[in-house]
Amino acid sequence: MKETDRKAYNIVKPNSFGYNPARINVGSIGYYSGAKDIIVSSLYEIFQTSDNIYDRFLWHWFKSKQFQNWIERLQEGSVRLYFYYDKLCECEIFIPTVDEQIKIGNSLDRLDNLITLHQRKYFLIFHNIR
């Protein structure tokens, strides 16, 4: 790809978070766990965590009501509200030890998987009754 073509994109490395600052209020945040670099629109904020953060723990915090409250408090703009990376860095979160983050993140993953399983079972039962 030509150098000039890359200006419209951000490179996303494995184990990175990315979000649209104008759409994060509706959950527009993702995590890339692939093996190779990819590109996304330059409109997205891309970041990686430090070694003292377990990404799955942070992922669940991003999906929490507490994080939504931070977005509502810190977003800025008039017609369209934005939540840029500098505002994300202003959010306050209690960070337990990495071992505790792993336990919490894994427990929440298991709970999410259990909920998904029951939703699928309900869907199959509901559609077979009709």
Regions found by a protein language model. Name each.
Residues 1-130:
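Feature detects amphipathic, helix-rich regulatory segments
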